[in-house]
Amino acid sequence: MLQDIVEQWQIMQQALAPLRLTRWQLTKMFAAQVYRDHPVGALLGISLSVVLLLWVISVVTRPKKLEDVLGLPVLGGSRTLKSDFLRIIEEGKQRYPDTPYIVNASGLQYVVYPPIFFDEIKRLTEQEASAQDFFHTVTYGQWTHIGAETDALWKTIAVDLARSVPVKVPSKQKDARIAFDKYVGYCPESKPVTIFDTMMKIVATTNACSFVGREVGTGEWPQVVQQLPMSVYFAVMTLSIVPRIFRPVLLPIVLIPALLVQRKMRKILAPGIRQDMEEYERAADRKELLKPTEDGKLPFTQWLMARYKPGEATAHQLATDHLLTSFESTVSTAATLYNMILDLAVRPELQDELRQEVEEIMVDGKLPATHLKELKKMDSMMRETFRVNPFALFSLYRITRKPIQLSSGPKLPAGTILCVDSHHINNSAELFPEPAKFDPYRFLKKREEPGAENRFQFVSTGPTDPNWGDGTQACPGRFFANSTLKVCLAHVLLKYNVSLREGQERPKMVSMPNGIWAPDMAAQVLFQSRD
């Protein structure tokens, strides 16, 4: 076929020579002729040309490998180690205990610093190295809006939402009861419950009742909220295994499910946001409107409107803020609750002890309207679960916004992803004797030491508490999450006995190819009602 095409070109050149056509005109005529005579071959040639062009663009625009720029070693090069991040950081700890190294994760390169750099990295300002930029990058935030939190949203969560926690405890207790009744129900006999999926729905419902009201929160909203992170993570994981040259083409396609979910969420939110905006504009006393009450939903939309500058608080922006809040408050809280339920399921005696603590602080069946610091045993168990089964092997994720020189290692150019090895903080024998042992009262005993009463709590941050991050960019929603978790755990303890099937071991977390620990989606726990 190629010889025929060459002959056609020569014949066409000779035949059309008297017309004195330009090369471009001649090429167009020749291409049309080839397509008529060899349509399949022409399409194949066009496809190969496009692939070749993409490859050339990829090679020309490909950034230099980070190891070539920084001169740091790269770990995890073999197929076996590429996704086994636990083995990677164990190797990193052994070979480079005091210096950084590079790992490849989901198509990106991370500079991993040892734990001794924790305090130095946490002190970096957002203008120097941004956590928000990191999450925006790894979740393709230009499409999904993840990691696009505004200052108004950040302050609303860190200040207004945190202050509202005590007053909402009684209402949240009702919301948790509604959620458990719907998704677990009354179990006179042991009932197997797929634990992560169920905890996702329960957390989504309990939180949604506070943010968007009980009517919306107990409708289809929890199911839609549950779909958002799954659709985003599907896109992220898919793109991470696709060659770089095809990602721009596939990105809009693999993100279609996430965009459709967001569209549905905006549609559900629209009437409530419109009503909230009208109430805020009509309010004669906005200070009174901004006060959270025990009943009803939080004035979350109004808090945002009060913090935005004139013209910024559009209905679209407010809906985006609600989407981000739902995304960030559901998955991490549900994964933590999943692990806590499993830790209770393998320790019946712990259930009895924590149940007694809950009963001692309740009055007329109600938890106190506080931050629930009274539940010291429960808090210690939660903190120990969080230590043994954290979100990830790393912490203090950042992307540098300008060149940064730390006390050791090379100067990091702008756009570098860095993080800290938090696994070897959580599993430090120096900090936590017998770190492999689950000790539910480990932190209760630490708080009994002189001067440590307010330390070592579930929401604590610091060089020995890496999982929430630290510094000015620590997780702002941890106080709200703490309340949701304690209310849900209290409900489980009072209403159910939980266990695993006889002979079954505690399901293990799964290492993802980006250093994150993922739950076993098929894991089940037996629930049996206590009355």
Swiss-Prot record:
Keywords: Heme, Iron, Membrane, Metal-binding, Monooxygenase, Oxidoreductase, Transmembrane, Transmembrane helix. Its cofactor is heme. SUPFAM superfamilies: Cytochrome P450 (SSF48264). It is a single-pass membrane protein. Its EC number is 1.-.-.-. Heme binds at residue 475. InterPro entries: Cyt_P450, Cyt_P450_E_grp-IV, Cyt_P450_sf. Pathway: Mycotoxin biosynthesis. The chain crosses the membrane at residues 40-60. One of its GO terms (molecular function) is iron ion binding. Coiled coil: none annotated. GO terms for cellular component: membrane. It is found in: Membrane. Gene3D superfamilies: Cytochrome P450. CDD domains: CYP503A1-like. It comes from the Eukaryota. GO terms for biological process: secondary metabolic process. Belongs to the cytochrome P450 family. Cytochrome P450 monooxygenase; part of the gene cluster that mediates the biosynthesis of the cytotoxic leucine-containing cytochalasans, including aspochalasin C, aspochalasin E, TMC-169, flavichalasine F, aspergillin PZ, aspochalasin M and flavichalasine G. The first step in the pathway is catalyzed by the hybrid PKS-NRPS ffsA that utilizes 8 units of malonyl-CoA to iteratively assemble the octaketide chain before addition of L-leucine by the C-terminal NRPS modules. Because ffsA lacks a designated enoylreductase (ER) domain, the required activity is provided the enoyl reductase fssC. This is Cytochrome P450 monooxygenase ffsD. It comes from Aspergillus flavipes.
